[in-house]
UniProtKB/Swiss-Prot annotation:
Family matches, as Gene3D superfamilies: Hsp33 domain, HSP33 redox switch-like
HAMAP family named among the record's database cross-references: HslO (MF_00117)
CDD domains from the UniProt entry: Hsp33
Name by which UniProt lists this protein: 33 kDa chaperonin
UniProt keywords, alphabetically: Chaperone, Cytoplasm, Disulfide bond, Redox-active center, Stress response, Zinc
Family annotation (Pfam families): HSP33
Biological process annotations from GO: protein refolding
Top-rank taxon, per record: Bacteria
Disulphide-bridged cysteine pairs: 239-241, 272-275
Amino acid sequence: MEDYLVKSVAENGQFRAYAVNATALVEEAHQIHDTWSAASAALGRAMVGTLLLATSGLQGEAGMTVKIQGDGPVGFIVVDGTAQGTVKAYMQNPHVHLPLNAKGKIDVAGAVGKTGTLSVTKMAPGDKTPYTGEVNLVSGELGDDFTYYLAQSEQIPSAVGLSVFVQSDDHIEVAGGFLIQVLPGASDEAINHLETTLRELPLVSDLLREGKTPEQILETIFAGRDLKILEKMPVEYKCDCSKDRFEKALASLSKDDLQEMIDNDHGAEAVCRFCGHKYHFSEEELKYLVATK
């Protein structure tokens, strides 16, 4: 099944609802970063959560950076997402495998840690000062933490479900999630019914493994109730790095630092943390940067 996200309104405009299948892009992140099972699940959930936040809360060319800093063995996780449904990510320690938790599932909270922060920085073209909101982690499972962020930082009552199923060989079998936002004027009856449904809902990974599409996941949540699909959009892992961008970073270094690279290494190599692409700068290119200072 292809990776894509759907946007909808439900219960005659009482809820906004989003669902995404992100299996291929989470597998791509696994391939790029050589993530082990617990790290794959943590990184995958962070990427799916960022996709849902970015596509629901941004417009045009705007983007956001989500940083999760817990006290678990994976260290920090950084994810960039855009309104267009693209995402890229990296993490401090991708080689984390843990025993299964008490429910027999991958221990994402153990990998991320239960103490730490989740921050979201939003940037739009022309913005001089980006907006950043930050909350403490509440569980380290990440779905709860994104839900808490939306309630505390954006004052949007929401429910976020994130799920990644990792195979025994560390490949990603399925990955996806949903985001439901309660809109002003939603009735107590509708909210209570939704809460009951979500408590009984299977894991998103189980629904995806059954072959359910993002539309069918939302139909399962709002079974027998009004649901209007508004948009279907592709999502993908996409890095926008370039040699020009790394050259600007090198140009910001001091003359002494650049000269040291010339004298010791006769050049420089930059590696993108998001995609692993390597960019080589020759001795002549570095000398040009020194001469322009």
